[in-house]
Amino acid sequence: MDERLLSGESAYEDADLEYSLRPQTLRQYIGQDKAKHNLEVFIEAAKMREETLDHVLLYGPPGLGKTTLANIIANEMGVNVRTTSGPAIERPGDLAAVLTSLQPGDVLFIDEIHRLHRSIEEVLYPAMEDFCLDIVIGKGPSARSVRLDLPPFTLVGATTRAGALSAPLRDRFGVLSRLEYYTVDQLSAIVERTAEVFEVEIDSLAALEIARRARGTPRIANRLLRRVRDFAQVRGNGTVTMEITQMALELLQVDKLGLDHIDHKLLLGIIEKFHGGPVGLETVSATIGEESHTIEDVYEPYLLQIGFLQRTPRGRIVTPLAYEHFGMEMPKV
């Protein structure tokens, strides 16, 4: 698991906290206005027709609220949610056990759905399309297929890598929603709401400062608030002020744009060793000692979002904005 402070991936200590902070309705949910408004319409229409909601695929970077939205969908539909993940479903029998335990209308939430094995996907296809399950009983010549009817249900899949889903699986989702990075104002509102739940006083400017450095991600904003709260209690009077916030984030090595030592290592590695690029992903991986898929899925998305890095056919290139951030001159071609 990635223990990095600025990782959007969920850490062990985040789980209970996120559950306590999780909004229960779309009205309470901050941000993701486009996805939220569309879901409001689809949910209301399904309820008016007394049908289950179409299967929903939520995709986007980690930490943006996919699990929260899955739970909200179940709450808005007035049904239960059953949660599992792609890696947890190892055999067709595991999936069959989950599907046959569902009640009519229930939401089945599969996190990291792109990690489902293809043999599992094939069992899922008839379940999604026809609400039935084909089970093979026995082996060899005496084997026979038995079809079980399933109650109507809604599958909500979440993934950080929509492109890794097979086309047949992706095409079976009726609703596809991409979750975007949050604005500073949205994150500031989330930080203030979290501080209220924590019963911690926070200045509005301090909330904005945390939001600016949270990489557009609510999970990171809440994690930073927890760490800043520690400094406020030990080094201050318990109130999260602008002064305490700036001091804490500096000591935590989170700069004004939300970059940490790993981001600096990646960008400066390309600048200093490869004159800013282009350089291939595998070479970057060997240079900074991180696995290529971790660089691609965890570190690069935010650097691409803020325009510090470009992916080109010839490799990664550091942009003039990154040079400016480090106070360096871009080499002349």
Swiss-Prot record:
Annotated localization: Cytoplasm
Catalytic activity: ATP + H2O = ADP + phosphate + H(+)
Residues engaged in binding DNA: 311, 316
GO molecular function: ATP binding; ATP hydrolysis activity; four-way junction DNA binding; four-way junction helicase activity
Region listing for Head domain (RuvB-H), in residue ranges: 256-333
Region called Large ATPase domain (RuvB-L), residue ranges: 1-182
EC number, as in UniProt: 3.6.4.-
Gene3D superfamilies assigned: 1.10.8.60, P-loop containing nucleotide triphosphate hydrolases, Winged helix-like DNA-binding domain superfamily/Winged helix DNA-binding domain
Principal EC category: hydrolase
Region (Small ATPAse domain (RuvB-S)): 183-253
Protein name per UniProt: Holliday junction branch migration complex subunit RuvB
